[in-house]
Amino acid sequence: LYLYHTVIEQDSDIHINPQNTLNEGLNIRTVTRLYTNGGDLYPEITDRFKSINLPKWIDFKIAFGAELVPPTKPYLRFPTFSDKILVFNQDISSDLFAYIEDEYMEEETGGGYFTEGLPSKEDLVSQYWESMLTIEEYLNYKPYKEPEILIFETVPAKLIEYIK
């Protein structure tokens, strides 16, 4: 099974040279595209709801995203090389991000514009943790439509293939 990581086109304002990734491996410092990471939106709440039984390596500050299907070229491709790859429900991350948008737009909208009808941030973070699966579990059951795949360690450079 391969995972994929988009490379933003070179003529884009946000292009990051993939050569860094090919030299050093893929990690939070060498990503070529930002993906959603619901666990890092409200770190204080995320930490409060984190089970004490979870491994220490689950640290959203170092996590970065990937995809299950090949995106539009160019992209990076690598095998699922580790058990430090987890899947969360991306819809929950989107709902959490609505709170970020609400805070940003509060002066203009009066607050609550993006979050009306949503559960509290705390409830969403709790649901986010409950949605956590290993990549194998997700592939076996596919309990939600939009997976948020997060990798919690560096993908070794020797495993990465650049597809142009």
Give short role names for the model-derived ranges:
Residues 1-2, 6-12:
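Nuclease and nuclease-like effector domains acting on nucleic acids or nucleotide cofactors
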Residues 4-6, 66-68, 88-90:
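Short His-Asn-centered micro-motif
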Residues 10-16, 20-36, 62, 73-164:
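Conserved NAD+-utilizing ADP-ribose enzyme module
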Residues 35-57:
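Short aromatic-glycine-(Arg/Gly/Cys) micro-motifs in beta-strand/loop hairpins
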Residues 43-46, 64-67, 128-129:
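A short linear-motif detector with a strong N-terminal bias
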Residues 53-77:
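Extended catalytic/binding region for NAD+/ADP-ribose chemistry, centered on the ART fold
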